[in-house]
Amino acid sequence: MNLKPESYILRIGHRPERDQRVTTHVGLSSRALGASGMYLAADDAKVADSITDVATRFGGTFFCENNVKWKSCINQFKKSGGKVVHLTMYGLRLQDVIADIRKEEKVMIVVGAEKVPGDLYELADYNVAVANQPHSEISALALCLDHLYEGKELDLAFPDAELEVLPTKIGKTTIKHEHDQEKP
């Protein structure tokens, strides 16, 4: 299933000394809920490697690019025809703008950690709020992706998974897949 529009996440303001867990969860939530990849505007190879490892083990084509320059990343994305959605509690209500965002070909969803630079508000095509209240950036991202894809992301398949989780009423059931590896 190919979800439209394509979505990419830009994580800005990540502080390696204190944000590893939250940023990792931003990446994992993005992957599970249909985003194609994440750009990390900080140098934290450990976080990027952790997200990439999960994507490899659980399938799909999600990527995590480490140490991007956030403003250049946004400008290149916009130059390629993409639109930028900045999640902020000060933006327009998600429910009022999501129909317009769905019409775009591809979107970059910007998720901040600390106070974001003021010029981000100007660079964004959409400044979007989930509830216009302070809360978790992970919950804002999850709700944004769910509204963007109208629940279709919950039925995604993740090809080439090494490990697959099966829905079960009680307990835990997984399948370990053996993939043929090409030898050099």
From Swiss-Prot:
Keywords: Cytoplasm, Methyltransferase, S-adenosyl-L-methionine, Transferase, tRNA processing
Enzyme class per UniProt: transferase
Source species, domain of life: Archaea
Catalytic reactions on record: cytidine(56) in tRNA + S-adenosyl-L-methionine = 2'-O-methylcytidine(56) in tRNA + S-adenosyl-L-homocysteine + H(+)
Gene Ontology terms: cellular component: cytoplasm
Assigned EC number: 2.1.1.206
Entries under Gene3D superfamilies matching the protein: 3.40.1280.10
Residues at which S-adenosyl-L-methionine binds: L87, G112, A113, E114, K115, V116, V130, A131, N132, Q133, P134, H135, S136, E137
CDD domains: aTrm56-like
Pfam families: Trm56
Cellular location(s): Cytoplasm
Broad class of the protein's primary localization: cytoplasm
Calcium found in the keyword field: no
GO molecular-function term, one example from the UniProt record: tRNA (cytidine(56)-2'-O)-methyltransferase activity
GO BP annotations, alphabetical order: tRNA nucleoside ribose methylation
Purpose: Specifically catalyzes the AdoMet-dependent 2'-O-ribose methylation of cytidine at position 56 in tRNAs.
Assembly description: Homodimer.
Family, similarity comment: Belongs to the aTrm56 family.
Official protein name in the record: tRNA (cytidine(56)-2'-O)-methyltransferase
